[in-house]
């Protein structure tokens, strides 16, 4: 289960969502917590909240460099969410990071970061840039096992 503190939570509801996360009693082995992007106040607040829980797998939204993981406690496993051109370009470096246990990609945010308005063609298929990103992230993850 993914508990989302990023896009699924309105800005005015972030504090309440963090409080609910602290109070939740879900199985930590079955929960991933998606946090706000590095470089935001939300990222720091989300990590502080996580340290008050038993949840230990964090999905880092809009990850762009491995340096952004330096403030993540070594007790946490990381899933790097590649949602920008820079993030996709660093997929191999993410996969090699000692705390990273998985990679994901996000088509809509990727296309928006490039100035586009939609990741899919009129027929519903992904545009080439999204298909490339998906393949690159998959290959980076597969190469690391």
Question: What are these model-derived regions, one by one?
Answer:
Residues 1-145:
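Expand to "…catalyze enediolate/carbanion chemistry for C-C bond making/breaking, isomerization
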């Amino acid at each position: 289960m993914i508990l989302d503190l990023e896009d699924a939570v309105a800005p005015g509801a972030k504090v309440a969502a963090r409080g609910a996360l602290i109070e939740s009693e879900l199985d930590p082995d079955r929960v991933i917590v998606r946090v706000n992007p590095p470089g935001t106040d939300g990222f720091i607040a989300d990590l502080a909240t996580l340290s008050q829980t038993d949840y230990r797998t964090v999905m880092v939204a809009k990850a762009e460099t491995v340096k952004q993981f330096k403030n993540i406690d070594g007790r946490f496993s990381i899933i790097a969410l590649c949602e920008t051109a820079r993030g996709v370009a660093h997929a191999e470096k993410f996969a090699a990071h000692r705390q990273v246990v998985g990679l994901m990609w996000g088509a809509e945010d990727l296309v928006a970061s490039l100035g586009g308005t939609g990741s899919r063609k009129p027929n519903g298929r992904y545009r080439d840039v999204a298909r490339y990103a998906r393949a690159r992230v998959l290959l980076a993850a597969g190469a690391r096992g």
